[in-house]
């Protein structure tokens, strides 16, 4: 697997190169968004680790340009500001996952493994749509609709919704969701799951549709027509 690491901080680039290489990845480095896009165009990697704040062309614009051309390259965004608006901006731009700085290398590696696992194609799989209320998800074509409205989701959002729609009206614990969607458990202080649930709600309720994804306080989440 070839990973392109893009960060204007040389120390960060080298640290990630060493860690990813040690864990069996082939790693290439770029110092800003312009160089990254040139490298992707000439020899597309399997995944992208992308800093947000960079000179010339920032990470969010790199995401937007790739997604605007239909490129679904897996993207893990690194952000120095762990605010909701910053994370939403990354997801809006098309990132599949985000990781706030400073981060543990073990967590970055775990997220990368989970992201690459979600990108593996299902050979010879039949397209069987999953439906709950007026929400439909096709796990093979990756199409999602609410009524007649198409919904565009990142890989992480899709995996989260797929788990919920596969377990209708069943309360799913936070730890189970983290394990199944991300492949590992976040630190208990992390609120990544809450951010993704919130963003998924925004997309599935964009036209004022009734809420289907509900919080079960102290436990997790459930997909149902009415609040628990």
Curated annotation (Swiss-Prot):
CDD domains: REC_OmpR_PrrA-like (cd17627), trans_reg_C (cd00383). Its main location: cytoplasm. It comes from Mycolicibacterium paratuberculosis (strain ATCC BAA-968 / K-10) (Mycobacterium paratuberculosis). Phosphorylated and dephosphorylated by MprB. The keyword DNA-binding applies. Keywords: Cytoplasm, DNA-binding, Phosphoprotein, Stress response, Transcription, Transcription regulation, Two-component regulatory system, Virulence. The modification 4-aspartylphosphate is found at residue 46. This is Response regulator MprA. Residues 2-116 form the Response regulatory domain. The keyword Ubl conjugation does not apply.
């Amino acid at each position: 697997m070839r990973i392109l690491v893009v960060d204007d901080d040389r120390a960060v680039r080298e640290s990630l190169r060493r860690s990813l290489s040690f864990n069996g990845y082939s790693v290439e480095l770029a110092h800003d968004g312009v160089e990254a896009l040139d490298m992707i165009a000439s020899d597309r990697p399997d995944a992208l680790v992308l800093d947000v704040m960079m000179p010339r062309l920032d990470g969010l614009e790199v995401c937007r340009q790739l997604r605007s051309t239909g490129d679904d390259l897996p993207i893990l965004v690194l952000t120095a500001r762990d605010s909701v608006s910053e994370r939403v901006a990354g997801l809006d731009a098309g990132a599949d996952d985000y990781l706030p700085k400073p981060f543990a290398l073990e967590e970055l590696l775990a997220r990368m493994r989970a992201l690459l696992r979600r990108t593996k194609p299902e050979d010879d799989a039949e397209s069987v749509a999953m439906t709950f209320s007026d929400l439909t998800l096709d796990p093979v074509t990756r199409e999602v609709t609410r009524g007649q409205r198409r919904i565009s989701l990142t890989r992480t959002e899709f995996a989260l919704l797929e788990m919920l729609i596969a377990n209708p009206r069943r309360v799913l614990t936070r730890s189970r969701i983290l394990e199944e969607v991300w492949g590992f458990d976040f630190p208990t202080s992390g609120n990544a799951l809450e951010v993704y649930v919130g963003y998924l709600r925004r997309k599935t309720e964009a036209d004022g549709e009734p809420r289907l994804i509900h919080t079960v306080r102290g436990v997790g989440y459930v997909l149902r027509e009415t609040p628990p």
